[in-house]
Swiss-Prot record:
5-phospho-alpha-D-ribose 1-diphosphate binds at R78, R103, D130, P131, M132, L133, A134, T135, G136, G137, T138, D201. SUPFAM superfamilies: PRTase-like. It comes from the Bacteria. This is Uracil phosphoribosyltransferase. One of its GO terms (molecular function) is magnesium ion binding. The keyword Signal does not apply. Catalyzes the conversion of uracil and 5-phospho-alpha-D-ribose 1-diphosphate (PRPP) to UMP and diphosphate. Its EC number is 2.4.2.9.
């Protein structure tokens, strides 16, 4: 597993505003979109391309195009949906799938409640969007789900991670070539499995609390 923490002053600035408890939801959503676009630049560093011949207004020349099939972007519902716009700003021709997973707050078990993905992901580059890598349970289960569909080239884009979550991914995924791109690795998890200092519940802050 390869972990990349993006070191950039704009990333640090936007993340600081996200952390602030009084940042309202509309501003929070906009900042997530902007921050994810910055993370996506790094996450797509190894996106597959091929040479193409193009015609400029002056002459024919060689260019570069994304290969087919196009990359697949998979937000983990619901909070991952808030990251989708930022990712597709950078790769608008990507296909989008959806994976609904939630953590049971009582047992901390991961429940899969929805999925909309191709049956066969063999040969596809997949970008998983999940803002908070806390215990690592959700992301680990999502990656295993994608593996069962044939995916091998998986990059996870997250805003924050806890060391415990990264350790769990490393333990459960072994030597698999998963890439994780982050804005920050925070201090720890608290007794409720929230990231400290974190930014609170990303889904609630994106969309408001839904009981």
């Amino acid at each position: 597993m390869r972990v990349t923490v993006l070191d950039h002053p704009l990333v640090a600035h936007k993340l600081s505003v996200l952390r602030e408890k009084d940042t309202p939801s509309p501003v929070f959503r906009q900042l997530v979109e902007e921050l994810v676009t910055l993370l996506a630049y790094e996450a797509t560093r190894d996106v597959r391309v091929e040479p193409v011949t193009i015609q400029t207004p002056v002459a024919e020349t060689q260019g570069t195009a994304l290969t087919r099939p196009r990359p697949l972007v998979v937000p983990i519902l619901r909070a991952g949906l808030g990251m989708l716009e930022g990712m597709t700003h950078l790769i608008p021709t990507a296909e989008v799938g959806f994976l609904g997973m939630a953590r049971d707050d009582a047992t901390l078990d991961i429940i899969t409640y929805a999925e909309r993905l191709p049956d066969d992901l063999t040969g596809r580059q997949v970008y998983v969007l999940d803002p908070m890598l806390a215990t690592g349970g959700t992301l680990s289960e999502a990656i295993k789900f994608l593996y069962r569909r044939g995916a091998q080239d998986i990059t996870c884009v997250c805003l924050l991670a806890a060391p415990e979550g990264l350790d769990r991914l490393e333990k459960e995924l072994g030597d698999s070539e998963v890439n994780v791109v982050l804005a920050s690795v925070d201090e720890r998890l608290d007794e409720n499995a929230y990231i400290v200092p974190g930014l609170g519940d990303a889904g609630d802050r994106l969309y408001g609390v839904v009981d």
